[in-house]
Structures are given as C-alpha cells and as structure tokens.
C-alpha cells in the first residue's frame, strides 16, 4: 500500500502527500509514521536523484562521443530504504564499461546515496557490522 505520493511537480520543487492510519497504541502509531516517512523518503530521494540524470543526448568524454544505451533501472540505498529509478547509461563506440553521469554528479558511492554512506561510515566507526544492521533496523526501520 502506497503511503506517500508526489502530488505536484514544478521546475524548482515537488510536493509529497503522506497518509497514515490511526493505530490502537502509540507504539504502533509511531511505527506506522516511521514506515510512511521512510516510504516518502525513498520516493523523494528517487525524485532528487533523477535531477542529476541526463536527457539521453550524446556526451563527450575525452574527445570521444558516448551514446546512451537508454534508461536502465537501478536500486539505490538511501537512509529511508531502497529507491529504484531509471537512469541513462552511456557507452563509448569501442564498447566496454558503461558510464552513468547521474552517479558521478549525485556523488553515489557504489549504490549508496551520500547521506546513507555518511550514516554507515559513522556507525561502522562506532560499532561492528552486526550491530550496525541491528541499529538501522531497530532505530530507523531500515533493513540492510
């Protein structure tokens, strides 16, 4: 069930609507709020990521014209959960590895957004990996 949706887009911003059902206990209510906020966060992060994509036009890298292979789906890790978007992947005329301008321009680290990478680095510096997973799930509603 979708708890969050984009209800308006303009050139400079977008508006999100969130719906949360009342619950019988406050703890259940807070968990429902966290779920809705995380869903909205994934939706908004995906929208933010898309602003860093190209329009698919050819690009020049080192004097070589690279062309888009089209929109290809990828899932990114965010502080709120996973955000799946379609973005352009480019390839040189010689083939080989593809290049994603969105990932460079949005400063993606492997599949993590900058904020999520910062959160993970801070937690790993303090805890071991199993404790990081427990903390993310217990305190942020975020399974990794």
Describe every region a protein language model picked out:
Residues 1-93:
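Short, conserved DNA-binding cores of transcription-related domains
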Residues 10, 83-144:
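Short, positively charged, Gly/Tyr-enriched micro-motifs
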